[in-house]
Amino acid sequence: MATKVYIVYYSTYGHVERLAQEIKKGAESVGNVEVKLWQVPEILSDEVLGKMWAPPKSDVPVITPDELVEADGIIFGFPTRFGMMAAQFKAFFDSTGGLWKTQALAGKPAGIFFSTGTQGGGQETTALTAITQLTHHGMIYVPIGYTFGADMFNMEKIKGGSPYGAGTFAGADGSRQPSDIELKQAFHQGMYIAGITKKIKQTSA
């Protein structure tokens, strides 16, 4: 039976979604792994989103809390708001109380990825505060560490991401798109976490 990896994200302007697409490619590069992209529900009105100049959402399906249980491993992605995950994603986690009560997600590997506007925008604080959500669910947090190799030490270019997970800088006006090195790190994260998820499933079978 194939290992199921879900990539669950929220994206306002497409930066997190672009990383999610690359993470999906990386996870799919691991044999016998099925990967699915999901969005979390939007909580802002169309009026507010319009004033934010947010583009229309893609056709990626919106997930419900109960659907998380179907996955063997989950990679969560979100933009940063004042140093922590966006309210849309926090609202989704807040809706998983039923899963918390039964510990339905306990033992599942989980990773995180993120986007900030600037280099001081909170990439690591967002990761650190997100880990609390995984902890209360009993999930196994899987950071990428320095497994991405030499590019983790690249100082020649602006680069998002960290040992906590893949990341990108959107720029203060959102005009900067994920760079090649950021996309490569996202691919690596998908491949890395899918591989670990597959190993855990095989050993627990």
Swiss-Prot record:
Keywords: Flavoprotein, FMN, NAD, NADP, Nucleotide-binding, Oxidoreductase
Cofactor: how bound: Binds 1 FMN per monomer.
Enzyme class, spelled out: oxidoreductase
Domain of life of the native organism: Eukaryota
Activity regulation, per record: Inhibited by dicumarol.
Role noted for this protein: NAD(P)H:quinone oxidoreductase reducing quinones by a two-electron transfer mechanism. Can use either NADPH or NADH as electron donor. Can use menadione, 5-hydroxy-1,4-naphthoquinone (juglone) and 2,6-dimethoxy-p-benzoquinone (DMBQ) as substrates. Mitigates the toxicity of exogenous quinones in the rhizosphere.
Protein name: Quinone-oxidoreductase QR2
